[in-house]
Amino acid sequence: MKTNIYMAKKNIPMQPENFELETNTVWAFPDRGKWATHDAKYRGNWSPYIPRNVILRYSKENDAVLDQFVGGGTTAVEAKLTNRNFIGVDINPNALEITKSKLNFECEFNPTISIMRGDARNLSSIADNSIDLICTHPPYADIIHYSEDIDGDMSLMPMKDFLFEIGKVAEECYRVLKKDKFCAILMGDTRKKGMVKPLAFETMRIFEAAGFKTKEIIIKEQHNCKATGYWKTNSIKFNCLLLAHEYLFIFKK
């Protein structure tokens, strides 16, 4: 296929080199991950090292993995490379097209992959207790807008509305996930008028209220937060520190 030819010409490996599973609760990936079809063009997407670690630790080959905020397709690519069946959902048609293009390569595995438009708050097409692992990266309320006016796009919601709606997401996660299986959610905090708004821990409490138990709280360092230019000026002006970490919550049903 054309994608494989392009990767060969650019000498892009199909799998990461010298990969090792993370063994503690602080993760840092200065290298974004340069294998297969991964890139950082989709704003706010996560490093492929994150879903790879989650998928390899909390699932096995041929398991069903769900990402209901599929975005730029990073989790989808990692599911394919690790031989997991995959369901990718997003409310944004543009995200679905990007994900499909990212999956346009051949590798040694051929898992079942389904990419569909849908709403993470209502996964009616997915049966109860049918998913082995949820691995997803929701928007952080309205920090980054992924569309201008798509109805139901949670990236357009202010924090109060977002937290109400993430409760519906948590309930759907609990419904579709099998008992004793895991749900991984990456979430970050934000600031309003110089004060930290703990979006991540509010989200954690909401998932616990839906029935989940918190197995791990992982601090993920951000490496695109440089104290230069605009950010340095505002840090000094408002006397506040740059938020340079996110939280990866591992929940168990």
Regions found by a protein language model. Give the residues of each.
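Class I S-adenosyl-L-methionine-dependent methyltransferase catalytic core
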Residues: M1-K253
